[in-house]
Amino acid sequence: MVLTHSSPDLLTIGKRNFHSRLFAGTGKYPSLKVMQESLRSSGCEMVTVAVRRVQTMASGHAGLIEAIDWSKIWMLPNTAGCATAEEAIRVARLGRELAKLAGQEDNKFVKLEVIPDSRYLLPDPFGTLEAAEQLVKEGFEVLPYINADPLLAKRLEEVGCATVMPLGSPIGSGQGLRNAANISLIIENARVPVVVDAGIGVPSEAAQALEMGADAVLVNSAIALAGDPITMAEAMRWAIQAGRQAYRSGRLPERAAASPSSPTTGIIAEAKTK
């Protein structure tokens, strides 16, 4: 593939295009001001909003909706805190109304999370599939958070999900891409965008996900809990751009043996024998 500076490289989800391949979370920041500056520094164009936490004015979420310029950033309501498919479907509907209140009348996106496991926060594959099927029927653009299960990813694609979002490692763990082999299988077989979600701790791991062929990453804790969230957000921004460019450029094939970068003919010793 030959790239030029004018080569378009938009990420399309549903009917919406994005330039940035970094999706950011809005939780865990030390203040709304730091969140605002971090989002600006990241260059992101879509952020997740935990519908239940906004509704209940949970710590760090009071004033969240008013703090973001929704004319520039697309809202991705999520169903965090839902343990069953029924709960997730109900909260997704509330999320659609929340997006409308923010001025995004045509926003039907939902990040689907069905998590009954309170210790490791691992998603329920059965509840996720059940909720996804119903929400797709209702016209939602469903972005499901899942374990790195290639079969489940394909099934969710088949029922009409707009993306699949396999976890790199447990939410907030900072363990990186522990499921890289399975994520690669998902990427290889997917016909919808693959967004690596959860577990990314440092920019190099975000770059790795894009180098593998992931279409985007979602990062929250690694930015919000950094010593300097604003600078970390910028670091993630450049790492993701670098990873994407590397993927599009095509990496050097791996070899079992060395391959010299200098010519092996016409060397000095050879010239002296003549």
Curated annotation (Swiss-Prot):
Q: Which InterPro entries match?
A: Aldolase_TIM, Thiazole_synthase_ThiG, ThiG
Job description of the protein: Catalyzes the rearrangement of 1-deoxy-D-xylulose 5-phosphate (DXP) to produce the thiazole phosphate moiety of thiamine. Sulfur is provided by the thiocarboxylate moiety of the carrier protein ThiS. In vitro, sulfur can be provided by H(2)S.
What does the record give as the active site? 111 (schiff-base intermediate with dxp)
Its family?
Belongs to the ThiG family.
- According to its UniProt record, in which pathway does this protein act? Cofactor biosynthesis; thiamine diphosphate biosynthesis
Q: Where is this region: Disordered?
A: 251-274
Compartments annotated for it: namely: Cytoplasm
Q: Which GO terms describe its molecular function?
A: thiazole synthase activity
Q: Where does 1-deoxy-D-xylulose 5-phosphate bind?
A: 172, 198-199, 220-221
**Subunit structure, interactors included:** Homotetramer. Forms heterodimers with either ThiH or ThiS.
Q: By its UniProt entry, which SUPFAM superfamilies does this protein fall under? A: ThiG-like
Protein name per the record: Thiazole synthase
Keywords linked to the UniProt accession:
Cytoplasm, Schiff base, Thiamine biosynthesis, Transferase
Uppermost EC category: transferase
* GO annotation terms (biological process): thiamine diphosphate biosynthetic process
Where does this protein come from, organism-wise?
Answer: Prochlorococcus marinus (strain MIT 9313)
The answer, when asked if Lipid biosynthesis is one of the entry's keywords, is no
Q: Name one GO cellular component term.
A: cytoplasm
Catalyzed reactions: [ThiS sulfur-carrier protein]-C-terminal-Gly-aminoethanethioate + 2-iminoacetate + 1-deoxy-D-xylulose 5-phosphate = [ThiS sulfur-carrier protein]-C-terminal Gly-Gly + 2-[(2R,5Z)-2-carboxy-4-methylthiazol-5(2H)-ylidene]ethyl phosphate + 2 H2O + H(+)
Pfam family of this protein, just one? ThiG
Q: What is its EC number?
A: 2.8.1.10
